Amino acid sequence: MKRSEKYLKYGVKLEDRYLIYEEENRRVAVPYAHIAFLSVSKNNLVIQTNSMEKVVIKLDTEDTANALFEDILVFIQRLYIR
């Protein structure tokens, strides 16, 4: 399974330049270049942007939250290495 598709059951898709998060009645695209703050708290991943928007992604385990955290960091690094 590709890294970008690993989190689809949680409503998260990792693209080359942005993250897409879908909830019941909301769909959000967060460009990696706009992420100012990224943290893991138990099984939640918190993303805050430069404009102070905050997205909280609820995952099933802390390990999954940590894995998503690491994968987002990889995508951010790729963005700035290009």
Model-derived regions: residue spans:
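Negatively charged, low-complexity tracts enriched in Asp/Glu with abundant Ser/Thr
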Residues: 1-22
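Acidic, Ser/Thr- and proline-rich intrinsically disordered linker/docking segments
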Residues: 2, 7-8, 27-28, 34-82
